[in-house]
A protein has these predicted regions:
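Bacterial Sec-dependent N-terminal signal peptides
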Residues: 6-32, 203-215
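Proline-enriched interdomain boundary motifs that mark the N-terminal boundary
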Residues: 19-27, 109-118
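Short beta-strand segments of immunoglobulin-like
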Residues: 26-32, 117-124, 160-161
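Short coil/turn motif common to extracellular beta-sandwich-like domains
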Residues: 33-37, 69, 125-129
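Surface-exposed binding patches on compact interaction domains or structured appendages
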Residues: 39-73, 138-171
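A short beta-strand micro-motif common to beta-rich folds, especially ectodomain repeats
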Residues: 82-94, 180-195
Length: 215
């Protein structure tokens, strides 16, 4: 009942008394994929600050500080990709509280496309960059894509590196082969989302595999 009363008072912008340094209603807030805004209630008896722990182009807050019991308006864009989150960090004196703002996926995993259209590549010994044709509908999640490489043989020194991923191609760079023998690598592109709202373990999806043989 006390929490409910506090929320109503904060929502109405009425002054209330709070005898603790800093408090939030929860550690998680689940956001709809369609986008919008939501009020975050902050309870404090002193000055406080808030920031996003890492920048997110899809989210914004209307203030960076406040005093006493108040609220922060968190705005978020429509999510056309997989689940994502940003963490708000509140601080008052020496106390720190975090709030996970988790946004639901805008696309089902079963509908995700990540297809590399070149099944194999015979690379020259001198190395260099190579473009692979790529078909994906995760065009809003490209920055979170990674390259997964499995090397054949005993020498696992990395020699295949990701340069960039776009909606129509994956660019990798290959080191010069100084081993004196051909070498092979199996390559996939992966994307890891934020998993469930109350978990720090994401779910990873993979593209098809391509084989690279370097002379």
């Amino acid at each position: 009942m006390l929490i409910a009363a506090l929320v109503m008072l904060v929502a109405c912008d009425k002054p209330i008394e709070y005898n603790q340094t800093l408090g939030l209603l929860s550690e998680y807030n689940v956001l709809k994929a369609e986008g919008g805004s939501t009020d975050v209630a902050v309870f404090s008896n002193t000055n406080w600050t808030v920031k996003m722990q890492s920048p997110a182009e899809w989210a914004s807050i209307d203030r960076l500080s406040g005093e006493g019991c108040s609220r922060v308006i968190f705005s978020f864009e429509r999510n056309y990709g997989r689940s994502r989150r940003v963490v708000l960090e509140f601080q008052a004196k020496d106390e720190v509280r975090t709030l996970n703002m988790y946004q639901n996926s805008g696309i089902a995993d079963a509908d995700v496309k990540m297809n590399i259209l070149n099944p194999s590549y015979d690379a020259p010994a001198e190395g260099g960059e190579k473009d692979f044709m790529f078909d994906t509908n995760l065009i809003y999640d490209l920055e979170r894509m990674e390259l997964n490489v499995a090397y054949n043989g005993d020498d696992v020194t990395p020699w295949v590196h990701l340069v960039s991923v776009s909606a129509d191609k994956v660019v990798v760079s290959l080191d010069k082969n100084d081993t004196g023998a051909p070498r092979q690598a199996k390559v996939k592109v992966s994307h890891t989302d934020e998993g469930s709202w109350n978990s720090t373990m994401g779910d990873t999806l993979y593209s098809n595999e391509i084989n690279i043989t370097q002379q």
